[in-house]
Amino acid sequence: MKRNSYLVLALGLFLVMSCKNNSKDTDTPETVTVNTTAKEIHKAAPTTVEFSSDEVAIAYSGYNAIKTALVNTNFSEAKSKAETSLDTLRRTELKSGYIDALALLAVEDNIDGQREAFEAVTQEMTNLVEGNIATGKLYYQYCPMAFNNKGAYWLSNEEAIRKPYFGDKMLKCGLVERDIE
């Protein structure tokens, strides 16, 4: 019996000692390393092309700002640039399907909808700039993978690919289909 008492006492003492927190509480801050990847923000290349029409120049400037916002996956910036461009173009003499396509982009409520609408905006802008370039050139670029491999085009001031249809996903994938001079 005495032996069982010693056994229970030893077991209890062992449990108490093993559950004791031996860590020393110091106020040493814990260092946490966070791996972040900086998102590349694309800035539009300067426009070196000159147009034979002020209205086309105004329209292209707005187009380029919208494209840059889509490259950067910036929904609110794309919406704001589309609305501003629409307001400006409605006060000009420009009569084009571009304004109608731009109006559809301006009312989209998400970035994917804006990107889909941008395809029609690009088609209309291409119609506007062809034959209206006085000096310089634009690059007519293509992504075969856009919209479930249907493909889509866009215009750029620079030969380097910065695709508006995927944002930072596959940003530099695509090709220059032709120059527009």
Question: Across the structure, where does each feature detected by a protein language model lie?
Answer:
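Post-signal-peptide N-terminal segment of Sec-exported extracytoplasmic proteins
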Residues: A38-D87, R91
